[in-house]
Amino acid sequence: MGIQILPPQLANQIAAGEVVERPASVVKELVENSLDAGATRIDIEIDKGGSKLIKIRDNGSGIPKDELALALSRHATSKLHSLDDLEAILSFGFRGEALASISSVSRLTLTSRTAEQTEAWQAYAEGVDMAVKVMPAAHPVGSTIEVVDLFFNTPARRRFLKSDKTEFTHIDEWLKRIALVRGDIHFTLTHNGKTVRNYRPAMNEPQYLQRLTQVAGRQFADEALRVECQHDDLRLSGYLQSPWSTVLTDTHYFYVNGRLVRDRLVNHAVRQAFAQKAEVEQPGYVLMLDIDPHQVDVNVHPAKHEVRFHQSRYVHDYILQALQSALEEAGELGFERPFEPSSPQVRDEVSLSESGAQTQTEHHAFELQSPESKTHSTWDEASRVDTSRAEISRDSSLGERTRDIASTRPYAGVQSNAYGSMAVPRESRSGSTGESRARAELPSKVAIASYGELLQTPSYNVQDKPYQPVLAMPAILNGQYWVLAQEQNLSLLPIQSVALATRSHEIETKLATGLIGQPLLMPVSIAADTDWPALLEEHETLIRQLGLELTIRYQQLIIKKVPPYLRDSQLAKVIPEWLQSLRFEAPAPNALAVWLAEQSLTGFTSAADIWAAYCQLTEEKRQQIADKAVSLPWQSWLEEQAIE
C-alpha cells in the first residue's frame, strides 16, 4: 500500500480517539468553548451517562451564521492566528479539533446566535458524512450544542464505555474541578431529567467557600488554610488542607492560568511542604497558579492535561516556599490540633481556663514583607532600635484588612509573611476554642518607624550627598588602571584592587557594630547538610553580626536576610561555601570583610565611585593601597628610544 493522504472523515475519527475518550471528554471540550465565548451561565444536560445525549447551553457571544459550518471543520479556530498567539495562549481551546472530532463520532447539532443577528441559525453534522446543514432556528444570544448517540458509528469505542453511573461520575468530577477555578460562572448539571448540581456564582469569599463546601466537603472547607502569594509575575492562591487533619480527601486540584492540570512538580512541592507537619500522606489542596503565559507551554498533551514550565525548578521552589510559609504561619497563629475533652465537666473547665487567660506564643525573628506589598501587616511588640541597627521581633498580628476576616472566624489571626502569603486558619465546626484567642494589639508608632527603617536600609553605594573627592582622579589606562605620577615615578594602580580595599575597609568598620540584614522578597531554600544546625547554633553571634538570618526547616536551609553586600550574589552557592569554611575555623573580621567585599564588587558603577571611596580613607590607608601600584620603568624606555 502506497503513502496517501487520509480522507478528512477518517482523519477526524483518528483525532477523536485522542480528543474524545469518553462522554466526560465531550463535556470538557464543549464547556471550555462556552467559557472562551464569555458565558456567565452554562447548563449541562446528560442522558444515560452521556452516551445518549449531551446538551450544553450557554449565554456566551455566539457564533455568526457564516462561521457555523467552518466551526465544524478541522483546525478552524478564532483563538489564535500566529505562533506568537500559541506561545501566549490563555484560552482553553486553540487547536480547532474538538467540534470536528466530536461531530465525526456522533450526531451533532449546533445552534447559535450573536447579539448582532436578529435570528439564530443551526448547523447539523452526522458521523462520516461530515456534511454540514445550516438552517434558521429560534434561540437567544449564545449557543446550544447537542451531541446525540456518541460513538454510534464506532461500535468498538462504544463497547469500552462503562456503566451510565460511572460515566456520569466522570462528568460530575470534571464539573467540580472547573467550578472551583471559575467561581464567577453559574453551572447546572442535569442527569436523566433530574438536577444534580447547581453551582451559583461566587462573587465574594463567603460565596466561594459555599462552593468549596459543595465540591470538597464541609470539613475540608472549614479547616482549610487560605494561601495568597504574589511575587513578580507569579501568583499562587487557593486553599490547603489543615496539616493536623486526619481526614482523607481526594481534593487535589492544581490550576495553571485557570487550566486544570496534573503536574508532578506541584505534588512534590505539597508533599515536601507537609513533610513534618501533616498526619496524612497526601494532603488535599486547591491551588491556582497565575504565570506569564510565555513561561509555560500548554501544547504538550493531546488533552491539555499537562503543561511544561520553562523554569520548572523556580516554580517548584516558589510553590514550596509559599506553602511552607502558610503552614508555619498557621502554627504560629495558634491553629493547633483540635482538643475535644471527653466529659462535659472537662469541657467547662477548659472553656473557663481559656476565657480567663490569654495565650502567649513565642515567635522567632521573621522575614518582613517587601515595601511594594499591598497587604497590611501589624505586630504586637515595638521594635528595639539602637544607633547601630534596627531589630524587629515578630509576634502575632491583626491589621485593618484582617479584622473583617477575623470577625467571621473564631481563629483571630491572619499574618502576612515574607512571600506576601496569608495563612487563614478556618473555623472548625466542632470546636469553639478560637473565640478565646487573644487579639493582637495594633503596632506602636515606634514599631512602624522601625519597620520602615529596616526595609529602607540604603544600599552600600548610595549616599544622600555624593562625596566630592578633594584629589583629582588620575588618568585611566585600558579601563583597568590608574596612572599615578609622583615626582619622578610613574606607576599603575589596578582599579579592581582599590575597589576591593576600600570596600573591605568599609565593611570591617561596620562589622564592629554589626551589619543590617535586608529581607529577601523571595527567600532562598537549599538542601541542608546534617551538621548545619550545629554550625548555626555554634556561630549564632557571628551570623547575626553579618546581618544574616538563616533557619533550618524540613532539612532545608532557608536564607531570609542577607547584608546588602550579598544581595547580588548567588546565595545558593555562596552561603553553603561559607558554612563549609566554618567547619574548620571562624574567620577573623578582616577575612570576613575581604570575603564580603569580593562578593559585592559589582556594587560600584564607575571608576569615579571607586575613587571617591578611596579619597575618603585616611592618608595612611591610602598610602598602603598606593604602595601596591606597579612601577613603570619609563626612564629605561626613554633611554632605549634615544639609542634607536
Swiss-Prot record:
Pfam families: DNA_mis_repair (PF01119), HATPase_c_3 (PF13589), MutL_C (PF08676). CDD domains: HATPase_MutL-MLH-PMS-like (cd16926), MutL_Trans_MutL (cd03482). Keywords: DNA damage, DNA repair. InterPro entries: DNA_mismatch_repair_CS, DNA_mismatch_repair_MutL, DNA_mismatch_S5_2-like, HATPase_C_sf, MutL/Mlh/PMS, MutL/Mlh/Pms-like, MutL_C, MutL_C_regsub. Residues 373-400 have a biased composition (Basic and acidic residues). Residues 336-400 are annotated as: Disordered. GO terms for molecular function: ATP binding; ATP hydrolysis activity; ATP-dependent DNA damage sensor activity; mismatched DNA binding. This protein is involved in the repair of mismatches in DNA. It is required for dam-dependent methyl-directed DNA mismatch repair. May act as a 'molecular matchmaker', a protein that promotes the formation of a stable complex between two or more DNA-binding proteins in an ATP-dependent manner without itself being part of a final effector complex. This is DNA mismatch repair protein MutL. The lineage of its organism: Bacteria, Pseudomonadati, Pseudomonadota, Gammaproteobacteria, Alteromonadales.
